[in-house]
Amino acid sequence: MHKIPKGTALAFDFGEARIGVAQGDAELGLSHPLATVTGGSNDEKFAAIAKLVQEWQPRYFVVGLPVHADGTEHEMTHLSRKFGRRLNGRFNLPVYWVDERLSSVCAESLLSEAQVLGKKRKSVLDQVAAQAILHGFLEGGPAECFNGREG
């Protein structure tokens, strides 16, 4: 269990094509889906993220780390870590990485219960996965912090 930072957080479900974003606050005990970032280049994606950072003024980021069922890392794990390091480098905010193994399953379940179907489901799936990642973090699940220094 980790100490939950105070203030607003932005959480990310990173993918090469789409990045789901959620916003939340531990003190309020709330989190909600926010946006799905798409775009061709990393610069376009980070420009969209910069607008969200400006609007929500987060104190930290939470990034989901995809791993195999046995906990071992793979290519997307490394890309997610790289994304988190870029967030830290661009915005100078700490990044907490959390295991996202069940976030997509949780998101699918929530959307099924809410009867969100078709194109609408696809458009919000990554956002709801980011919300699940953030919810797990705010509930005190395991996390690893990166603040610009390896080690």
Swiss-Prot record:
Its EC number is 3.1.-.-. One of its GO terms (biological process) is rRNA 5'-end processing. It is found in: Cytoplasm. One of its GO terms (molecular function) is nuclease activity. The keyword rRNA processing does not apply. Its main location: cytoplasm. Belongs to the YqgF nuclease family. This is Putative pre-16S rRNA nuclease. It comes from Neisseria gonorrhoeae (strain ATCC 700825 / FA 1090). The lineage of its organism: Bacteria, Pseudomonadati, Pseudomonadota, Betaproteobacteria, Neisseriales.
